[in-house]
Amino acid sequence: MTQTIMTRQDIAAKAPAVLETGVSSNVSAKYVHVPTIELIEDMEKLGWNVVDVKQVGSKKAGANAYKKHLVTFRNEAVVIKSEDGETVYPQILLSNSHDGLSAFTFRAGLFRLICTNGLVIATKEFGAVSVRHKGYSFEELKGIVMGLVEKLPVTVETLNRFREVILTEDQKVEFALAALGIRFGENGAEVSVEEILKPVRDEDRGDELWKVFNVIQEKVTRGGFKYKASTGRNKTARSIKNFTRDIELNEQLYELAESYVA
């Protein structure tokens, strides 16, 4: 299953705040505003199309119209092919809002074709790039995109290292417990580590860091596993819906995986 390019109608149905051209009445008259649709049009000129959108809060007309939202872009011409045949698409994630509370921010991500799962890259080379609305220009955007693309060899090198590292059973358990700690925080939760480490698909079976990382990342972010909460109640973990939390969780998991690379 691949991601398809979203039309304006698709975007409006899933995250109408993305297409909002106005600004919140709470901002001052001096506030300089760059609507997200302008950024989308500029990204399309550079060959990057929208494949996913999300927004904070309700999607009803007028509700949260100016709140934070996330747009995921992909360029079909930019793709990473591994030696074992796996296809990974680099992505660019844009977060923005029309309430005057934040600049728009770009991050790098990866999309695994094998499981339609998205990862957020969290390295010194791929730190989030924030741009103020005031003074925005197409040339600045072009420079940001080119900068991210130029760093792709670093991503390929990192993914190759992930594939070369073989984890012991103890290390896999350690990784899973650390990931659960990131998901549930100090409150903790009783979870079957075996369930977290059990691959969803045959392609992810193995002891390579890359495979273990993807298995755990998918479970921790998408949920679906049983756990006992600190209250003693049995629950089923839900998928992370808040995209800000999802990005944060992904970044922390990526950093955790990197800690296993010598």
Task: Write out the residue ranges for each language-model feature.
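Intrinsically disordered, low-complexity regulatory segments
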Residues: M1-V34, E41, K45, G57, ...
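Short amphipathic alpha-helical segments
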Residues: Y31-L39, S137-E140, I144
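Intrinsically disordered, low-complexity regions enriched in serine/threonine
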Residues: T2-Q3, A77-A262
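Amphipathic, interaction-prone secondary-structure segments
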Residues: H33-F104, D246
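A broad "ordered helical/assembly scaffold" signature
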Residues: N26-V27, V53, I144
